[in-house]
Swiss-Prot record:
Similarity-based family: Belongs to the universal ribosomal protein uL22 family.
Oligomeric form and interacting partners: Part of the 50S ribosomal subunit.
Keywords for the protein's UniProt record, in alphabetical order: Ribonucleoprotein, Ribosomal protein, RNA-binding, rRNA-binding
PANTHER family from the UniProt entry: CHLOROPLAST 50S RIBOSOMAL PROTEIN L22-RELATED, LARGE RIBOSOMAL SUBUNIT PROTEIN UL22M
GO CC terms: cytosolic large ribosomal subunit
Keyword Transcription regulation part of the UniProt annotation: no
Originating organism: Shewanella frigidimarina (strain NCIMB 400)
HAMAP family in the cross-refs: Ribosomal_uL22_B (MF_01331_B)
Alphabetized GO MF terms: rRNA binding; structural constituent of ribosome
Name used for this protein in its record: Large ribosomal subunit protein uL22
GO biological process, alphabetically ordered: translation
Function, in words: This protein binds specifically to 23S rRNA; its binding is stimulated by other ribosomal proteins, e.g. L4, L17, and L20. It is important during the early stages of 50S assembly. It makes multiple contacts with different domains of the 23S rRNA in the assembled 50S subunit and ribosome. The globular domain of the protein is located near the polypeptide exit tunnel on the outside of the subunit, while an extended beta-hairpin is found that lines the wall of the exit tunnel in the center of the 70S ribosome.
PROSITE patterns associated with the record: RIBOSOMAL_L22 (PS00464)
One protein family per Pfam: Ribosomal_L22
């Protein structure tokens, strides 16, 4: 049984979120939650929310036991980029890219 949860349009770049996702892939759910709880990265908070949601989905929809769940797959895809302008000296302007990402977590029983 596999259960998934998604967070779409998360306000972090996919590159930064993938650093966190790579740390928990394939781990038991309890160990993954510990790692995410104590990680100093902003993306860890977002990934933890999605993991909690996937666990709740498995419990509620499939009747799964939390102790037997592991992180089956975690992947982060790029979302749309918001483009903004930053005024600079002498009438110039720089483009600011505010990147978003789509975080997907799949939990499966061992």
């Amino acid at each position: 049984m596999e259960v998934l949860a998604k967070h779409r349009f998360a306000r972090t770049s996919a590159q930064k979120a993938r650093l966190v996702a790579d740390q928990i892939r394939g781990l038991p759910v309890s160990k993954a939650l510990e790692i995410l709880t104590f990680s100093p990265k902003k993306a860890a908070v977002l990934v933890k929310k999605v993991l909690d949601s996937a666990i709740a989905n498995a419990e509620h929809n499939e009747g799964a036991d939390i102790d037997e769940l592991k992180v089956g797959a975690v992947f982060v895809d790029e979302g749309p980029t918001m483009k903004r302008i930053m005024p600079r000296a002498k009438g110039r302007a720089d483009r600011i890219m505010k990147r978003t990402s789509h975080i997907t977590v799949v939990v499966a029983d061992r």
